[in-house]
From Swiss-Prot:
Gene source species: Enterobacteria phage T4 (Bacteriophage T4)
InterPro entries: Soc (IPR031743), Soc_sf (IPR038151)
Role of this protein: Capsid decoration protein which helps to stabilize the capsid against extremes of pH and temperature. Once maturation and expansion of the capsid has occured, trimers of soc attach the interfaces between the hexamer of the major capsid protein. Acts as a 'glue' between neighboring hexameric capsomers. Dispensable for the head morphogenesis and phage infection.
GO cellular component: viral capsid, decoration
Superkingdom in the source lineage: Viruses
Family affiliation: Belongs to the Tevenvirinae Soc family.
Subcellular location as annotated: Virion
UniProt keyword terms in alphabetical order: Capsid decoration protein, Capsid protein, Virion
Protein name: Small outer capsid protein
Keyword Kinase: no
Subunit organization: Homotrimer. Interacts with the major capsid protein; three soc molecules associate with each interface between the major capsid protein facets.
Zinc found in the keyword field: no
Parts forming coiled coils: none
A Pfam family matched in the record: Soc
């Protein structure tokens, strides 16, 4: 079910941390009502832009709240 209120398209950038650790960059599109209800952006390196249709292949619709919460946390996952 495509959002009738548009999407927030999020592009995060790779962040190198101490040692060999990093946070991977990602591109996702989130239905606006879901994004406005649940999102974490503090201290992040990211950009967003609104659009009528999803801009990226990874898309979270309004009925995917649980999946979006997990993916939102994963945006800031440290690896390495």
């Amino acid at each position: 079910m495509a959002s009738t209120r548009g999407y927030v398209n999020i592009k995060t950038f790779e962040q190198k941390l101490d040692g060999n650790k990093k946070i991977e960059g990602k591109e996702i599109s989130v239905a606006f009502p879901l994004y406005s209800d649940v999102h974490k952006i503090s201290g992040a390196h990211y950009q967003t832009f609104p659009s009528e249709k999803a801009a990226y292949s990874t898309v979270y619709e309004e009925n995917q709240r649980t999946e979006w919460i997990a993916a939102n946390e994963d945006l800031w996952k440290v690896t390495g």
